Amino acid sequence: MIGALALLLVIALGEEDKEPATGFASHRIVAHAMGGINGYTYTNSLEAFVANYEQGSRVFEADLLLTTDDRLVARHEWTINMSKLLGQQTVLPAAKQGTVLEYAQFMDSPILDIYSPLDIEKILDLMQAYPDAYLVTDTKETEAGLVTEQFKLITEAAERRDPALLERVVPQIYSRDMLDVVNKVHVFPEILYTLYQSQDSDEQVIDFVQESGVDITMPAARATKSFVQKLKKAGARVYVHTINDEDEIVKLSRMGVDGFYTDFVSEVDLSSFRRLR
């Protein structure tokens, strides 16, 4: 009996001694595609960033693609459906609505008539203006040459302003091999291994976390309590995407999930969820 009480005391003291998370790890919300704005998603726009920042979000995921002239811009995909979703049927010629754009045409095409497109230069300008904001990259590409090109563009643009900006850039990688490709360009302090393209088994992912120290993000469908707990035991913070429902956030949080990619839930909203652990 005395031994059991002593063990409980040790556990309790251990919990009290845990340092609160700081920096990137202190935030639980990742604003998906710069966050939703006025009910719209996937805008990756300047106005979405500002609106979600004002609502308390500090971590912003941006979709980043190369233009035909090799500039890095914030767009989810080069498809007709995306052009329709972004309300660009009138600002883009029909032949351009489902193809990769030139940089100038992309930047000169308003989103939903009123929102401003972003490129990596303007995103880094925002990070300078908002010095507690973090960027999570969703660069899509997996071929080593394209990955290298994308991350060189990111690092070179940051270094022209202030190399310290790179401390607030969090790359997403899509395979275990991609970590080495990114590290050859720049060693970022935080890396997220996103599993939505991965064919790795749970065991392979857990082993990779132990070897590399990366954190994990995954679709909700893959987030089982057992997998989440094993990842956390291996040392990872665990994120799930893309979640906009309070009940689902509460359920996943109780499983041990640390953070949530979301369109419409802010850090302020999260703090009001009474059932959240």
Where are the regions that the model predicts?
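Phosphate-group recognition and catalysis centered on beta-loop-alpha active-site segments
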Residues: G3-R277
